[in-house]
UniProtKB/Swiss-Prot annotation:
Pathway involvement of the protein, from the record: One-carbon metabolism; methanogenesis from CO(2); 5,10-methenyl-5,6,7,8-tetrahydromethanopterin from CO(2): step 1/3
Protein name, entry field: Molybdenum-containing formylmethanofuran dehydrogenase 1 subunit C
EC number from the UniProt entry: 1.2.7.12
Organism: Methanothermobacter thermautotrophicus (strain ATCC 29096 / DSM 1053 / JCM 10044 / NBRC 100330 / Delta H)
Catalytic class of the enzyme: oxidoreductase
InterPro entries: Asp_de-COase-like_dom_sf (IPR009010), FmdC/FwdD_MopB-bd (IPR041717), Formylmethanofuran_DH_csu/dsu (IPR012048), Formylmethanofuran_DH_suC (IPR017550), Glu_synth_asu_C_sf (IPR036485), MoPterin_dinucl-bd_dom (IPR006657)
Keywords, in A-Z order: Methanogenesis, Oxidoreductase, Repeat
Domain of life from the UniProt record: Archaea
Length: 400
C-alpha cells in the first residue's frame, strides 16, 4: 500500500518533515500517519495538519507528494527503502543521510540534497541548489555512497568532501565542484565555475563543458577521446599531501585555460596581464601576528607582497611594485620574482591586502574563496604606493 500527500495550503513557516519516509509509513494506518510529528518552526505538530493523506493501491512503500513543498525540509532524511515521488519543487536537505530507496522530483530542489548519504538514488528532473552530496558544516566527510542525478543545473560546492558514490549533472555546475573530494565520481555535462577539484585528494571529476579557471595545483597527464570529445586528464590537487585526484576537462572548450600554459601571444592590456590569484597563510605571517598585532612594518613586509613567476615578472618589465585588481578593487604590492610560482598565477599571503581582492562568495566548507580568482596584474606607476593596513581598512572596510 502506498500513500498520496497533498499540501492543504501554502507553508507560511518552513516545515521540518523527516518523518515523511516510506520505511516509517510501512505498517501504519492513515490515522497513525496523520499523527506523525513534524516541526513548524520550533513547535511540534501532526503531519495531518499540513497534508491531505490518502491511500493508493498502486505500489508498496511508495509516497507520492503532489504540490509545492519548497518550504518543507528533510523529506526522505535517513530513509532506508521505498520510493518517494514529488510532483513539485522541494526544500532543503532532501534525502540527507539516506541509506537506501529512491527519491524522484519532477521539479526543482533547494540546497543540501543528499548530504552525507550512504546509499539509494536521488533523481531531480530539474535544477538543484548548492552543496549537493556535501558534508555538514564542520564535517569533512560528505556523500559516502549512492547516486544523485540532476537533469538540470546545480549550484556551488557540489560533492564537497565526497567519499564515494556518483553525482551526475546534466547541465551546468557552479564554483568549487568537487571541493575536498576524497573519492567517488562527479560528471558535469555542461559548464562549471572556477576552481573545480580544489583541495581534492582522490576521486574523479569529468567536466564536458567550459570551466572558468583551473587551479595551479593540477598537472596535465594525458589527452584522449571520450564520447567523441577530446578530453585532458589532470592530476591534483598538488597543494594537498599525496593527491590522487583525476580531473578531466574538454580540450576544445577550454583553450583559454590551456593558452595560459605558454607565454606565446600574451599581451599587456591597459589593465595588465590576466592571471590567477591564490592566497594562503605563511609561517612568517603566523609568527608576526602571534601577539595579535597586524599593524607593524614586519607585517606589511610579509603580507603586502605579490609572488610572480619569472616569465610574468620579465613580461611586466621586472617591476618594483605591482597593482593587482579584481571586482573593481585594486591593491599595490611589492613585486617578488619567485621560481616556485607557475606562469599565469600569483601568490599573495593571506591578510588585509589579499582581502581587498577576495570575492564576496564565502559560503564553503573552508576557505577556497582564496583560490583560483581571475585578476589583472600590471606594473605600478611612480605615484602608486603600498597602503598601510590602517589605510586599507579605512578605504575598503576589510577586516583586521
Amino acid at each position: 500500500m502506498g500513500f498520496v500527500l497533498v499540501p492543504k495550503s501554502d507553508f507560511q513557516i518552513p516545515l521540518e518533515a523527516d518523518t515523511i519516509r516510506p520505511d516509517l509509513f510501512e505498517g501504519l494506518d492513515l490515522d497513525e500517519i496523520r499523527s506523525l510529528q513534524v516541526y513548524e518552526g520550533n513547535i511540534k505538530r501532526p503531519l495531518g495538519e499540513f497534508f491531505e493523506i490518502a491511500e493508493t493501491p498502486h505500489a508498496d512503500q511508495l509516497i507520492r507528494i503532489d504540490g509545492d513543498v519548497s518550504r518543507v525540509k528533510y523529506i526522505g532524511s535517513g530513509m532506508k527503502s521505498g520510493k518517494i515521488i514529488i510532483n513539485g519543487d522541494v526544500g532543503l536537505q532532501l534525502g540527507c543521510e539516506m541509506k537506501g530507496g529512491e527519491i524522484e522530483v519532477n521539479g526543482n530542489v533547494s540546497s543540501w540534497i543528499g548530504m552525507e548519504m550512504h546509499g539509494g538514488t536521488i533523481k531531480i528532473n530539474g535544477n538543484a541548489g548548492d552543496y549537493v552530496g556535501c558534508a555538514y558544516r564542520g564535517e569533512w566527510r560528505g556523500m559516502k555512497g549512492g547516486k544523485i542525478i540532476i537533469q538540470g543545473n546545480a549550484g556551488n560546492n557540489i560533492g564537497g568532501g565526497m567519499m564515494a558514490g556518483e553525482i551526475y549533472i546534466g547541465g551546468d555546475a557552479g564554483n568549487f565542484c568537487g571541493i575536498r573530494m576524497n573519492g567517488g565520481e562527479i560528471t558535469v555535462r555542461g559548464d562549471a565555475g572556477r576552481a573545480p577539484g580544489a583541495e581534492m585528494v582522490s576521486g574523479i571529476i569529468k567536466i564536458h563543458g567550459r570551466i572558468s579557471s583551473l587551479l595551479p595545483g593540477f598537472k596535465e597527464i594525458s589527452t584522449f577521446k571520450e564520447d567523441g570529445s577530446l578530453m585532458i586528464l589532470f592530476k591534483g590537487d598538488l597543494s594537498e599531501k599525496n593527491p590522487e585526484g583525476n580531473l578531466y576537462i574538454n580540450y576544445n572548450k577550454n583553450l583559454h585555460i590551456l593558452e595560459n600554459e605558454t607565454d606565446e601571444g600574451r599581451v599587456i592590456t591597459k589593465k595588465g596581464i590576466k592571471v590567477i590569484y591564490n592566497s594562503g597563510s605563511t609561517i612568517r605571517e603566523g609568527q608576526i601576528i602571534k601577539g595579535g598585532n597586524k599593524l607593524t612594518d614586519d607585517y606589511i613586509d610579509e603580507c603586502a607582497r605579490c609572488c610572480i613567476s619569472p616569465e610574468d615578472y620579465k613580461l611586466l618589465g621586472e617591476p618594483e611594485n605591482v597593482v593587482v585588481s579584481s571586482h573593481g578593487n585594486e591593491v599595490v604590492l611589492r613585486a617578488v620574482e619567485d621560481p616556485g610560482i607557475q606562469m599565469g598565477t600569483i601568490f599573495i599571503p593571506r591578510g588585509i591586502w589579499a582581502n581587498v581582492l577576495t570575492p564576496p562568495y564565502t559560503e564553503s566548507t573552508g576557505s577556497p574563496m582564496y583560490k583560483g580568482v581571475p585578476v589583472y596584474l600590471r606594473k605600478a606607476s611612480q605615484g602608486e604606493r603600498i597602503l598601510s593596513a590602517e589605510e586599507l581598512v579605512e578605504e575598503y572596510g576589510v577586516g583586521k
